[in-house]
Amino acid sequence: MTEIISLKQKRHQKELKYERKMLRELNLTEIKTRIDDCFRSFEGKFKKTIIEDGCIDFAIEAFLLGAKYSRFGYYGESMHSANKRCQFEEKRLMDDLFDYLLNWGKIKEGDLLIEELFLACEYYIHSWWEQGYTKGEKRYKLRLH
């Protein structure tokens, strides 16, 4: 006998399958080099291993978010307008990464590095979102989704 599953479960299974396929596109060494590029100026303020662990998680989340919204690019929407669709989720990722780095770093409340750190977090998350978007759009165009 066949098992009956709801539409919600089916969508969730399909989304997980797509995410697994997209994660094959990620490269850990590329993530680590991007971490070094973005957060090199804060080298004395953070312990590198702790920061790498968190940044890898946030890079994966941002990459998958961009890949999820790449479907709209396949149907003719620009990257900018697709980014506006997920502005709330991307902003949440930026804020969470910023809070993570503030909690694990040695940056004081009145320090001028806070604004610089926030801009670095914005750049880091948005660059991974863009990469996920372009790779996801490529997969859609090649019909590999």
Where do the protein language model's features map onto the residues?
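Intrinsic-disorder/low-complexity detector
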Residues: T2-H145
